[in-house]
A protein has these predicted regions:
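Conserved acidic donor-binding segment of nucleotide-sugar-dependent glycosyltransferases
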Residues: 396-404, 413-418
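Short hydrophobic beta-strand element within catalytic cores of glycosyltransferases
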Residues: 380-383
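Short alpha-helical donor nucleotide-sugar binding micro-motif in glycosyltransferases
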Residues: 342-343, 350-355
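A conserved catalytic-core segment of Leloir-type glycosyltransferases
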Residues: 34-167
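Conserved donor-binding/catalytic core segment of Leloir-type glycosyltransferases
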Residues: 232, 273-300, 425
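Carbohydrate-associated surface elements
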Residues: 237, 259
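Nucleotide-activated donor-binding/catalytic signature segment of Leloir-type glycosyltransferases, i.e.
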Residues: 323-343
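Aromatic "clamp/platform" in nucleotide-sugar-dependent glycosyltransferases that forms part
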Residues: 363
């Protein structure tokens, strides 16, 4: 079976759980022999990938469009049945209207300051790393402006046009679209090709925005869900939102839980644990309303009222980080809270090595991969009951996100009672092995077949 997959991000350039999930699922599909063409927007990240073929909105219907299939693809070691192609779009994961506008302004400033002979400025301003203009007979679609007038939704629809051009030159059986920014593209390609669309709901506007829902984004999500042949939800929690808030028939929805890469051995790392007399409690994730960072700090203050040898680490970035720094200071606990910014690689392994407990206080978490990553690294976890992962994880402490007293009590219990911490660590590390991407991939293949047959 051949899948045209539309996503926001793909390793090594990731900013959150969506990229990790896309990679895990795509690799497992490849291991099952499923052919995947993965289309993703440039978003500024993949300009370092010199072998990525980039389409530009300036010539989607131009002279080169009819000259044949674009033949320069990005291939990834270990993914035998996967090809990736990047389209020249500023879309990026977890984007909002404000962050989209800021990104356009940054790229515009880069163009303004780029001077001849200044390679760093030129590289910052360039839409793609093209060392020379293509010959007139070269295949593919290139050129055209990469900075667009208009808003984020306009960019979403421009991305849809570029994806439709990719689809014209490739054969596939099913379209698989991840989250709302790719839904219009999926609908467009489905209408043009007659092939079934499967949308994958990793989060909804209600998860991201609470009561402050953006009506236009909601409309895009709803149109994608209703226009799709099948809807994959990452949890029963998400399925409930999809059916109750978007009016999608329950029989059209399939729950496919996320997973984690399982190697059968502890994760290899050269990172040493930094010895400290303090207990370390870790928050790891985007610092946004959805993740509940203010509840983490409120619980931290209560913990520090009864324990003075605890430090709280907030690892991540997001639109609430400045507010959380100010809140920690206002609470009088700023000296006990460390904000690290976004972490990856060895820096991420360092904080896991230091952590005595990982806390996920999310207000609304469709799934939540970070607790599985923590358990895989022998870190016990305390998770919000308002999360998808709480449906399937047994050996974890659970709490309502708003119950800061109970959250603080459970943090103290783990830190003060080593046998409890040891039990959670050992049982959790064993339990996490059951979350395999191959199982998720097999479930998706079943959905593809059902979509293709109906």
């Amino acid at each position: 079976m051949r899948i045209l997959m539309l996503g926001w991000e793909f390793p090594p350039f990731i900013s959150g759980g969506l990229g990790t999930a896309c990679y895990g699922l795509t690799k497992a599909l490849s291991d099952l022999g499923t052919d995947v063409l993965f289309v993703l927007p440039r978003g500024g990240a993949d300009r370092q990938l010199h072998r990525v073929h980039v389409l530009s909105a300036g010539q989607t219907g131009g002279r080169d469009a009819g000259q044949g299939e674009p033949r320069t693809y990005w291939t990834v070691d270990g993914l035998e049945h996967v090809r990736l192609i990047s389209v020249d779009s500023l879309l990026s994961p977890y984007q909002t209207e404000r962050t989209y506008t800021e990104q356009r302004e940054r790229e515009a400033r880069g163009r303004q300051v780029a001077e001849p002979g200044d390679p760093e400025a030129a590289e910052a301003a360039a839409p793609v790393p093209a060392p020379a203009a293509p010959a007139p007979t070269s295949q593919g679609i290139t050129g055209g402006p990469s900075l667009y007038a208009g808003d984020l939704l306009g960019e979403v629809h421009r991305y849809a046009r570029l994806v439709a051009e990719v689809a014209r030159h490739n054969d596939f059986d099913v379209i698989h679209a991840h989250d709302w920014m790719t839904y219009p593209a999926g609908l467009s390609v489905s209408a043009l090709s007659g092939k079934p669309l499967v949308v994958h709901v990793h989060s909804t506007e209600f998860d991201r925005s609470g009561t402050g829902v953006n009506q236009q984004v909601y409309d895009v999500e709803r149109a994608g869900m209703h226009g799709a042949r099948q809807v994959i939800c990452v949890s029963r929690l998400t399925r409930g939102i999809v059916t109750s808030r978007y009016g999608v028939p329950e029989g059209k929805c399939r729950v496919v839980y996320n997973a984690i890469t399982i190697n059968g051995e502890p994760i290899p790392t050269t990172v040493e644990r930094i010895e400290t007399s303090d207990k370390i409690v870790l928050f790891l994730g985007r610092i946004t309303m959805q993740k509940g960072p203010e509840y983490f700090l409120a619980a931290a203050r209560k913990v520090l009222e009864v324990m003075d040898n605890v430090k709280f680490v907030m690892a991540g970035s997001g639109d609430m980080i400045r507010r959380m720094i100010e809140l920690a200071a206002a609470m009088g606990i700023g000296h006990r809270v460390t904000f690290t910014g976004f972490l990856r690689g060895d820096d991420l392994e360092h904080v896991f090595k230091m952590a005595d407990l990982y806390v996920m206080p999310s207000v609304s978490e469709p799934f939540g991969l970070a607790p599985l990553e923590a358990l895989q690294r022998d870190v016990p976890v305390l998770i919000s009951k308002q999360s998808g992962v709480s449906e399937v994880l047994t050996h974890a402490l659970k709490v309502d996100f708003w119950d800061i007293n109970e959250m603080a009590n459970k943090i103290v219990a783990v830190l003060r009672h080593p046998p409890l911490q040891k039990t959670l660590r050992e049982h959790g590390a064993f339990e996490v092995r059951k979350f395999a991407w191959l199982d998720a991939a097999r479930a998706c293949v079943d959905v593809y077949r059902e979509a293709a047959e109906t």
